[in-house]
């Protein structure tokens, strides 16, 4: 019995020395399943954070991967509210970034229901001659299927399209420009009569408002520069109305300017009006800011 006790004591000492040596050993079978086993909690050392974090420059914002992306595209916009659609041509510069101006051009009768003619009949080719492929703006050219920009829900549908494109391409909402030629110019007058200061600049070329009446108070919220040629009865007839329009806009505290394009008939007036000076003026305007005389 005494010998048995000595053996047990020796075994206990050996086990104690083995456990303190830092070597691992396997637990006896069943110990891990023992519900009375108490887990040993270990504390992880706290990580000391730096007092300040060096600021980093935010990445340059880019166009989100929505819609058609960069380049020139022919697309269609459908409105659930009005159950109608507008086809449109859009040019997004290849180096486009968020915050670019948006220029909206309304065509004349020659392109009605002819979306395929928009690239040549609009102003994209003119802009390309001035700026090359890298426009300093996104160009939107909607296409109407009837000879009007003012009938029915077209103004509301057009406004909805402009808003959708502005949101999709993250444009600078303080630089949304509206311009148009001939019947498109009538649409410009109509749109600024309804939405006024939503736009940063308005340039109607070769046409006053069809009805000879606009909401001058609303139109005075946006700077207006209008043009007309001086060859042909139609162009000369426009002069009295356009001059009257800008005079009243100026009288309402707005900015109105009328330029006669000497030596130009109705068709020639478009190329004469859309020159680099005109584009730069449009791009320089900001929503809610009326330039000085």
Predicted regions and their residues:
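A domain-start/cap signature at the N-terminus of enzymes
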Residues: 20-102, 179-181, 191, 244-256, ...
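Active-site machinery of serine-nucleophile hydrolases
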Residues: 102, 106-159
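C-terminal catalytic histidine-bearing segment of alpha/beta-hydrolase fold enzymes
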Residues: 225-293
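Gly/Ser-rich "nucleophile elbow"/oxyanion-hole loop immediately N-terminal to the catalytic nucleophile
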Residues: 94-98, 147-182
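Sec-dependent N-terminal signal peptides of Gram-positive bacterial secreted proteins and lipoproteins
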Residues: 3-24
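Primarily recognizes the serine-hydrolase "nucleophile elbow" in alpha/beta-hydrolase
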Residues: 167-168, 174-220
């Amino acid at each position: 019995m005494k010998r048995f006790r000595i053996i047990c004591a020796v075994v206990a000492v050996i086990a104690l020395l083995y456990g303190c040596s830092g070597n691992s050993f396997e637990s006896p079978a069943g110990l891990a399943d023992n519900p009375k086993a108490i887990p040993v909690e270990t504390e992880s050392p706290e990580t000391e954070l730096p007092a300040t974090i060096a600021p980093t420059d935010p990445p340059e914002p880019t166009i989100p991967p929505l819609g058609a992306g960069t380049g020139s595209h022919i697309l269609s916009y459908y409105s659930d509210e009005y159950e109608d659609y507008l086809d449109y041509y859009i040019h997004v510069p290849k180096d486009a970034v968020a915050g670019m101006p948006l220029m909206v051009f309304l065509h004349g009768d020659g392109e009605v229901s002819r979306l395929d003619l928009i690239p040549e009949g609009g102003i994209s080719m003119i802009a390309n001659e001035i700026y090359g492929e890298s426009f300093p703006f996104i160009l939107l050219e909607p296409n109407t299927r009837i000879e009007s920009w003012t009938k029915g829900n077209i103004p509301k549908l057009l406004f909805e399209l402009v808003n959708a494109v502005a949101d999709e391409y993250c444009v600078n909402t303080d630089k949304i420009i509206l311009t148009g030629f001939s019947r498109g110019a009538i649409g410009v007058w109509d749109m600024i009569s309804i939405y006024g200061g939503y736009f940063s600049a308005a340039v109607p070329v070769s046409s006053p408002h069809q009805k000879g009446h606009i909401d001058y108070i609303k139109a005075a919220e946006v700077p207006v520069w209008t043009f007309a040629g001086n060859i042909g009865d139609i162009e000369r007839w426009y002069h009295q109305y356009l001059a009257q329009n800008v005079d009243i806009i100026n009288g309402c505290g707005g900015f109105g300017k009328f330029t006669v394009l000497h030596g130009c008939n109705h068709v020639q007036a478009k190329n004469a009006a859309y020159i680099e000076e005109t584009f730069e003026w449009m791009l320089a305007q900001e929503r809610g800011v009326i330039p000085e005389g």
